[in-house]
């Protein structure tokens, strides 16, 4: 099983995938985030954040106040399972997390916490 995926983000406020499947044989999983647009991160920055689907709205709203220097995430937010930093055009960042943190029977989601992006930039994470 390939225990990694590359997710591209764009100036059109989108990720190139709406669903990430993790093979249950993976002990860890790595997400590399790229930005194929041309806009800088203060204008059209994106990050990749993993949480339970239920925690997603709260993380995003709390993150707005944190600002770009904290990647639009509240410091020490225990609801965040994994995240990249905010990147702009031509940049990339990656994060590796322990698959055992994903409990069976819980719905997980990924999203961008840049203010206003969550409505378009989100998807599901499942372990199969």
UniProtKB/Swiss-Prot annotation:
Keyword Disulfide bond: yes
Any coiled-coil regions, as ranges: none
Database matches in Gene3D superfamilies: Cupredoxins - blue copper proteins
Chief site of localization: periplasm
CC annotations in GO: periplasmic space
Disulfide bond residue pairs: 3-26
Molecular-function GO terms, alphabetical: copper ion binding; electron transfer activity
PROSITE patterns according to UniProt: COPPER_BLUE (PS00196)
Record bears the keyword Disulfide bond: yes
Binding-site residues, Cu cation: 46, 112, 117, 121
InterPro entries: Azurin (IPR014068), BlueCu_1 (IPR000923), BlueCu_1_BS (IPR028871), Cu-binding_ET (IPR050845), Cupredoxin (IPR008972)
Keywords from the named record: Copper, Disulfide bond, Electron transport, Metal-binding, Periplasm, Transport
Location(s) in or outside the cell: Periplasm
UniProt domain Plastocyanin-like: residue ranges: 1-128
Domain of life: Bacteria
Stated role: Transfers electrons from cytochrome c551 to cytochrome oxidase.
PANTHER family linked: AURACYANIN-B (PTHR38439), OUTER MEMBRANE PROTEIN H.8 (PTHR38439:SF2)
Record's protein name: Azurin
């Amino acid at each position: 099983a390939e225990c990694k995926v590359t997710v591209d983000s764009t100036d059109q406020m989108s990720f190139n995938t709406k669903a990430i499947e993790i093979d249950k044989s993976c002990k860890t999983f790595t997400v590399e985030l790229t930005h194929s647009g041309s806009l800088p991160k203060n204008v059209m920055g994106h990050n990749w954040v993993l949480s339970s689907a239920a925690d997603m709205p709260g993380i995003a709203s709390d993150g707005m106040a944190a600002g770009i220097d904290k990647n639009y995430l509240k410091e020490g937010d225990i609801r965040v399972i994994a995240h990249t930093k905010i990147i702009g055009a031509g940049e990339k960042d990656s994060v590796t997390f322990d698959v055992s943190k994903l409990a069976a029977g819980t719905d997980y989601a990924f999203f961008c916490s840049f203010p206003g992006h969550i409505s378009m930039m989100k998807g599901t994470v499942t372990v199969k």
